[in-house]
Structure formats: structure tokens, C-alpha cells
């Protein structure tokens, strides 16, 4: 009998509504989903499909209008502001399309900052920050500030920062959106390598078909609902052909 995997994210009947003037806009319409420890998941769909809203629900950046979101079986909606901040700091690492590095800080300082916020000592934070930057291939750039780094290098710093507090989940919102094709492929490969080495669940919201090659499952969202969920082995898309290679 195969070993049952631990569920790190579970959504039950998640709905999200927004008011547009006097009109109620239903963005998510009852999302039921389970994501296991160590999985690499891509959430894909057209603009306006609800994938970014679902991404924000999973990350504790917003709360559902109805339904429940559980992170490690903790109901996110029941947490107060302090508890939610602790959860986001310790359980979740974030990677953004626009990198969101602090421009006056070095690469090392950007990576150590989440650890300092979490109460890790300065020396331990610096040691781990160096190790993470080495791991993402920036061991020689730790004292460089963001403006001294290329877009791909800045995203590598952002990836190292996301892993700073040894999270259970990495949320990557369009992580290749601001990168050229070659650099985007390098970042995708790095994310998969970190996923495999660290055993962390990676969840991406993306339009990038290159993500299909490394995802364990792809969740297709359309009109606020899960249209289908496909395992990598079941996908028929040949990414090389899509990219014109």
C-alpha cells in the first residue's frame, strides 16, 4: 500500500466575492483542493479566471467570503492578525514577479531580514543567508545591492529569501513573468531543484507553459472554478514545440 502523503494545504468550498459598485462579483465559486507535502503545483488559467485570488487565499493574503482554507490543518480564517503574521513568516515563503527586494540592502541583508523578524540571532541568520545564496548560485554576489544584479540574479535572491525560515510552502506568483526565456528556464529549474532538495511544497500561479515540464500536478482554473486537475504524466503538451524550439 502506498504511503499516504501529508496534506499541507486544504481548501473546502472556498468562495470569494468582491463588490464592484453595487454589483457583487463572484471570483471564486466553491474551490475544493488538497496539496500534499513536497508537491510542485502550477495553478494555470486565463486572466480573470480567479487563479491569483485562489493563490492569495492559500497564502493568507486574503480571506474567503465563504468556505475554509487550512494550512497544516490550521483554519486561516480563525487566526487574528498576529497569528496570521506568524503563520506567513514561519510557514510560507513568497516569490513575486517583481522580486520585491529592498533596494538599499545587499543580497545577504535581503535574505536575512525574514529570519531576523522571526527571532533568529544575527549570526545564525547571516550563516544561513550565506548558505542559501550559495545554493542559488550567488555566493560571489552576497554584498551586491539589487541595482547591481540582473533580473535573474534578483529573482535568485528572492528565492533564497523565500526559503529563509524553512517554510512548508513556497508561493510563487508569476516567478518568470519579468524574465527573458533563457533566464526564466533557469529560474524554473532552480525552483524545482529547491523543491526536491528541501522537500517543500511549491505552488505557482503562472501563465508560463514551461512550468508544465516540472509540475507534479497542474490545476486549471476557469471562471472561478477548477476546470480540471492533471498529473504531469497525463499532460499532452510538448513545451519545446510551444516555445518554438
Identify the function of each model-found stretch:
Residues 7-221:
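ABC family nucleotide-binding domain
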Residues 218-230:
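H-loop (His-switch) and adjacent beta-strand-loop-beta switch element
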Residues 188, 211, 227, 235-236:
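Flexible, glycine-rich phosphate/dinucleotide-binding loops
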Residues 1-17, 228-245:
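ABC-family P-loop ATPase nucleotide-binding domain
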Residues 83, 225, 233:
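Residue-level detector of flexible, active-site-proximal loop/helix-junction positions
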Amino acid at each position: 500500500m502506498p504511503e499516504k502523503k501529508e496534506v499541507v494545504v486544504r481548501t473546502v468550498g472556498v468562495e470569494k466575492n468582491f463588490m464592484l459598485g453595487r454589483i457583487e462579483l463572484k471570483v471564486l465559486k466553491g474551490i475544493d483542493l488538497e496539496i500534499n507535502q513536497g508537491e510542485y503545483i502550477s495553478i494555470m488559467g486565463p486572466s480573470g479566471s480567479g487563479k491569483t485570488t485562489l493563490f492569495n487565499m492559500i497564502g493568507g493574503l486574503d480571506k474567503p467570503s465563504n468556505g475554509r482554507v487550512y494550512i497544516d490543518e490550521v483554519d486561516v480564517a480563525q487566526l487574528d492578525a498576529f497569528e496570521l503574521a506568524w503563520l506567513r513568516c514561519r510557514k510560507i515563503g513568497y516569490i513575486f514577479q517583481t522580486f520585491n527586494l529592498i533596494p538599499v540592502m545587499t543580497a545577504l541583508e535581503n535574505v536575512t531580514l525574514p529570519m531576523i523578524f522571526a527571532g533568529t540571532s544575527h549570526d545564525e541568520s547571516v550563516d544561513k543567508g550565506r548558505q542559501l545564496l550559495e545554493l542559488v548560485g550567488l555566493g560571489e554576489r552576497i554584498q551586491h545591492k539589487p541595482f547591481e544584479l540582473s533580473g535573474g540574479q534578483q529573482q535568485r535572491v528572492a528565492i533564497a529569501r523565500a526559503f529563509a525560515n524553512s517554510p512548508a510552502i513556497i508561493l510563487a506568483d508569476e516567478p518568470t513573468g519579468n524574465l527573458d526565456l533563457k533566464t526564466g528556464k533557469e529560474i524554473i529549474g532552480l525552483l524545482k531543484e529547491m523543491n526536491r532538495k528541501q522537500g517543500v511544497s511549491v505552488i505557482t500561479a503562472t501563465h508560463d507553459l514551461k512550468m508544465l515540464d516540472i509540475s507534479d500536478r497542474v490545476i486549471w482554473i476557469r471562471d472561478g472554478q477548477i476546470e480540471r486537475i492533471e498529473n504531469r504524466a497525463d499532460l499532452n503538451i510538448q513545451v519545446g514545440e510551444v516555445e518554438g524550439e
